[in-house]
Amino acid sequence: VKFIGDKSHFSLDLQNLMIENEESSKDRDGMVLNIAMNYGSRDEIVRAVKNISTDVKSGKIDVENIDEALFSNYLYTAGQPDPDLIIRPSGEYRISNFMLWQAAYTEFVIMNKLWPDFEKSDLDEAINIYSQRNRRFGGV
């Protein structure tokens, strides 16, 4: 379990609960469940740029070493692979400020169902649709 987003606006009790949950599952193998709370990708990117700038000013990193991999390490999802699939409920064809950097080569499946009504059969359908895709990772 990984909570992504600006946690500073939550109560200390809730922040501590998030930390406890992340700690209790950090050594597990397999998939990571990202729970986005107070998350906005533009904010995430601005925060990453500020933190990189601070580390450049302090001499921790050299400007010449800034690349996509280093930048990714400053995001909330540092250390995780980019998502293969994002399921977009509600039938909306928009990204809604969600994982703008990480979703560069992600496949999207748009489901015409609201999130509260989403069922296992919908997940199965989305995975089936995804499994039939020919992923090109930006290629033609």
Located regions from the model:
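Flexible, compositionally biased loop and terminal segments
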Residues: 1-140
